[in-house]
Amino acid sequence: MDRRTFDRKTNNPQRYRLDRFVATRDSFSETRRRRSWHAAFDVHPVNNDRWSEGNLKKKNYIKYLDKAFDLESPDKNKSIKRMNRLWPCIPRKKTYLSSADSILDLPTYSYAIYPELLDWSNDNMLVAALGSSYHKWSWRSQSLIGHGFAEYEIQCCKFDPRGELLALGTYMKTLEIHNNSKSKKIMSNTCKCLEIDNMNCSITAVDWSPTGNSFAAGCSGGAVTSFTRAAKLISWRHLVREAILLIRVSPNARYLAVTAMNTALVLLLSWPSLEMYSSIDSDWSIRAICWHPWRSALLGVGAVTDDLQARIALWNAPTREVRDTSIGPKGYRLDSMLFSHRTGELVLSMWHSDRATLHPKTCSQLVVLSDPDTMVDQWGEGRSGLDRVRTMIFSPDGTKLATATTDEDLIIWNFLPEDNKMKKTKCRSFSALPECLDNAMLGYSLR
């Protein structure tokens, strides 16, 4: 049976095996299928796991009793909490995280070497790049609305902040810029590895500046390039031997964070000149990096130690101050992390390797943290069916979360309740001036 991108999926990994005694998923109504995903299978949670749903309910009930009997001083505890908090956050007061209406298919995604083949534009359009083609799916109409093609196999993709352009990093050192409305290539450029280092590479990571007037690209040869919006070269720099895994431009358009595959190093470069500013060299394996949207340059770094202990570090770029802490019980690997631009909460995708062989699958969790010691929401403990999450992306309004898994599922989650009222979701005072300079200089910063 042919599989198409963004087709609705079944939870069964043997989805095309037919059994005359078992009704197929398509024979049930859509409402019943959605309920079955929420329920999945009942699995006993692991004891002594502080991230279990039972422990979360107990903790909330203890807080309720303490407040009811006035057994603590709220003002004192809140002030201490603010002093110890590693990142700014307005945590939720009740749980919202649940699977939404859509479980879609991502054929061949499990074979992709680099995870960032999924993005969500500001006009509520999801794009999935698979092979040498990309497919666009509308959240409003819940349907596939278009597709486009690249000259070579696509390794990564990213919409510009305005939703007008789509940057595609491809094989054979080529970076393509496509018009979003027409789904056609309008410009392209190449990495300078072949000219300078006599090495053919692939574009493995891409990210836009906050204004969309410039963007960065990393390659499999360990080099990083900055381009203007018109794909004109600004600067090129060779950094490491390993392939670049992730690159992130800071909210104030002054820094570029870079990490490579299977390394313990995070580099901080000035943007867009790509001059070395600072670095973190740890004993961990770096898995994820993301900037906090409410601060000018606060970088979150997710990693895993040799004894399988997940850790996060918060790096204040201007002061070069680093604070790190352990996250969760041992045995969990951190695969992806994001800060919510609505609440400031940190979302982690965790994977337990010892449970990966169990059936039904109980190896993955999505965890929402307000600080390293406080889990305010989670999905996965006591449930099954969620495979390892390789990448995540928020919807423009921050109420939905899209995840791509190794089981080739694209799952849309309810992250926050929908609110039709316009809210101020970003603290612009920290980045207004740098973004103004970035806008005026078309990606160049004069310092």
Curated annotation (Swiss-Prot):
GO biological process, one term: positive regulation of anaphase-promoting complex-dependent catabolic process
The WD repeat ranges on this chain: 108-148, 149-188, 198-237, 281-325, 344-380, 384-423
GO cellular component terms, semicolon-separated: anaphase-promoting complex; cytoplasm
Keywords assigned: Cytoplasm, Repeat, WD repeat
Annotated compartments: Cytoplasm
Domain of life (superkingdom): Eukaryota
InterPro entries on file: Cdc20/Fizzy, WD40/YVTN_repeat-like_dom_sf, WD40_repeat_dom_sf, WD40_rpt
One MF annotation (Gene Ontology) recorded for this entry: ubiquitin ligase activator activity
Protein role: Controls wing pigmentation patterning by regulating scale cell development, thereby playing a key role in mimicry and crypsis. Probably acts as an activator of the anaphase promoting complex/cyclosome (APC/C) that promotes the ubiquitin ligase activity and substrate specificity of the APC/C.
Protein family: Belongs to the WD repeat CORT family.
Official protein name in the record: Protein cortex
Source organism per UniProt: Heliconius melpomene
